[in-house]
């Protein structure tokens, strides 16, 4: 055991020389590249403990190499974390491509989405959500996805889903319904896409209210995208819709999306490409 301890101490207190290293006038080992010491003397009381007068020191070359290793490891851990957040946070892999970097810059509401991310801590503290409303294909879901991706790149958990999937999960899951909803509400930001497209059964409306009401009570922000108009939301058809819309409007600031239908444009481009391929 004593020999093993001595071997450990020997490794701890010995600097490993490289061929270009040299011994300086002070008797210490120096790096042959940066000319900085790779050893330092122990204080007298420490020298007595270790049974030798010197210990390894970090030269500039070693420091740079260590910092590069640490930075690479930090980047790897960050990428792993972001990958896991996106795996859990998105219900559709294509949402990973909904980023500000991939944006065509034509949506006038892009600035609002960017500022939401920039001021996320204030949005979170003050529980400020957004209601992206407007016509089909105007970029509501895309910009909501941009917000989700940008926050997850900052290692902030976000979940983006829709009520059709939520209702399917609730119907198929063996998990306690309240626990499922509580899990949704644990995310710092919840994004509900295509609100209003789910089936309007009594059961469905009750679960929609439960999710939105639970989110309201959690005190955490919510972003919703919908093709419904503000007039639809302010003039619900019945009491069941009224209490849902009331909760929603109390949590989310309405942001109107107008302009071109990007989906129609994309479909038109595909059609033109196909015609060109066929006629060439």
Which residue ranges define each predicted feature?
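Walker B catalytic acidic pair
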Residues: 194-195
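Residue-level preference for the first positions of well-ordered beta-strands
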Residues: 127-131, 158, 189, 221
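Walker A/P-loop nucleotide-binding motif
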Residues: 124-144
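A short, basic N-terminal segment
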Residues: 1-104, 267-280
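Pre-Walker A (pre-P-loop) alpha-helix and adjacent loop at the N terminus of AAA/AAA+ ATPase modules
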Residues: 88-130
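Short glycine-rich substrate-engagement loop in P-loop NTPases that contacts/grips substrate
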Residues: 108-117, 148-189, 199-206
């Amino acid at each position: 055991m004593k020999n093993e301890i001595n071997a450990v101490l020997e490794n701890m207190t010995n600097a490993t020389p490289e061929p270009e290293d040299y011994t300086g006038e002070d008797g210490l080992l120096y790096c042959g590249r940066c000319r900085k010491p790779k050893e330092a003397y122990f204080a007298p009381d420490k020298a007595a403990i270790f049974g030798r007068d010197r210990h390894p020191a970090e030269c500039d070359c070693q420091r740079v190499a260590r910092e590069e290793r640490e930075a690479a490891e930090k980047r790897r851990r960050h990428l792993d974390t972001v990958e896991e957040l996106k795996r859990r946070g998105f219900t559709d892999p294509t949402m990973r491509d909904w980023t500000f970097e991939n944006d065509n810059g034509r949506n006038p509401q892009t600035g609002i989405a960017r500022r939401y991310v920039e001021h996320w801590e204030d949005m979170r503290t003050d529980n400020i959500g957004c209601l992206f409303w407007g016509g089909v294909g105007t970029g509501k879901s895309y910009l909501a996805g941009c917000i989700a991706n940008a926050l997850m790149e900052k290692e902030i958990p976000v979940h983006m889903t829709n009520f059709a999937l939520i209702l399917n999960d609730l119907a198929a899951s063996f998990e306690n319904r309240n626990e499922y909803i509580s899990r949704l509400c644990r995310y710092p930001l919840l994004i509900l896409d295509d609100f209003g497209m789910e089936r309007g059964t009594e059961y469905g409306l009750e679960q929609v209210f439960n999710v939105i009401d639970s989110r309201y009570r959690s005190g955490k922000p919510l972003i919703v995208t919908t093709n419904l108009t503000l007039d639809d939301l302010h003039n619900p058809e019945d009491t069941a819709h009224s209490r849902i819309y009331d909760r929603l409007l109390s949590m989310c600031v309405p942001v109107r999306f107008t302009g071109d239908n990007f989906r129609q444009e994309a479909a038109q481009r595909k059609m033109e490409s196909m015609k060109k391929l066929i006629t060439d």
